[in-house]
């Protein structure tokens, strides 16, 4: 079994931002040389998430609206008593997956027709990192 690890780094420009990262993750899978296995993708931040869904603008906006209804920006969170102001970002990250594991088949991500990988940022405007770990077998 082989394990290959790389990190994605980028800057988010908005407090709340969905970043389509499928092409970058696919490139890491190709560079790994792994033919069959799994690709683990996880943000290295507690106010962010990784999820798989359709890359359609209306749906992305709907996800944001849904998350804001479930975890609105609100000054009354107990977390804010510590001097922080991002409790809603922590809660939104909990509602989406903190990480995802994707199948790798024949050296490529094995995604459905409309499946795409996203980094979801809820406390942005700074440099961010995502770990991508590909594990599996290399066929000769």
Predicted segment positions?
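Active-site histidine-anchored catalytic micro-motif
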Residues: 1-140
